[in-house]
Amino acid sequence: MNRDARVETAISHWAPRLISNGVLLADFQEVTGQIQRWEDWCAAWCLRAADHEGLGRASLEDGYHLTAGEHLSRAALYYHFAKFMFVNDVAQMRAAHAKAIECKQLALPHLRPPGERVEIPYCGSYLAGYLRRPSGAARPPIMIMVPGLESAKEEMEAYELPFLSRGMATLLVDGPGQGEAEYEHPIRGDFEVPAAAIVDWVLTRTDVDTTRIGLWGVSMGGYLAPRAAAFEKRVTACIALAGPFDFQDIWDNLPELSRETFRVRSHCATQHEAKAYSAALTLKGELRDRSTVRFSF
């Protein structure tokens, strides 16, 4: 049986990402080695996620809290990668996503440093996030971290650790079209709007330094972060990791899985409509003249 081209694409394009973000190499090889059809991707990863979830829950019962946090975080990551581009079956995708959130919530108090779930008011609803503060810091600077097209806050632990180890707090947030927000709020090119809501919320905290707020984004988040920073004057530094300068310009070169994921998460009916919608995701124009922050690309 020939392997589904979508499975081949997922493996060839995203293997380094999965492994560098915390998927064990043995798990990656065993899980992907048995998947022939894309329709089986989500279920296969959920099965392996359940193994780590079981180990985490058993560790909690036995009082091994650090081990529990590690296993439950890994379970959340695997459930996330089960659903990350599985937009062809929304029911399966949402079920896996719910498990990712559940496992991460269980893990947060047992991480070092521990984390807390936060809900940031936005457009009559909220944006969900995870806040972690380095040990021993009264009011550390804070880095707001923005996921990409098919990523979410449950994937971001490997990215946040360098900031935590250097004395910075981290706030991982699902923006519109991402993670918990993707079902209610579509992707939006004017990310300065949700960014303003996030910064407004940060300013209510007394346990971080609100004069030193950074904004970090990866992949599509590497577009969203500098776009927002060009407008949001309360942000003092920005890191853009591999973001597109103009999303519509790269549309035709994206894998089919990515185009379909963008369609679903922008709440468009067709890919033709989604391509037109993607024109809003651009750094062209006068944005450079608006920015007062320090950038790192």
Annotate the PLM regions.
Residues 1-41, 133:
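Long, non-catalytic architectural segments outside compact domain cores
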Residues 43-52, 93-138:
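N-terminal cap/lid segment of alpha/beta-hydrolase-fold proteins
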Residues 80, 200-257:
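Primarily recognizes the serine-hydrolase "nucleophile elbow" in alpha/beta-hydrolase
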Residues 133, 139-148:
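Short beta-strand element of the alpha/beta-hydrolase
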Residues 145-158, 170:
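Serine-hydrolase catalytic-loop signature spanning alpha/beta hydrolases and amidase-signature enzymes
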Residues 155, 162, 185-211, 227:
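Alpha/beta-hydrolase active-site loop
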Residues 163-180:
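Conserved alpha/beta-hydrolase
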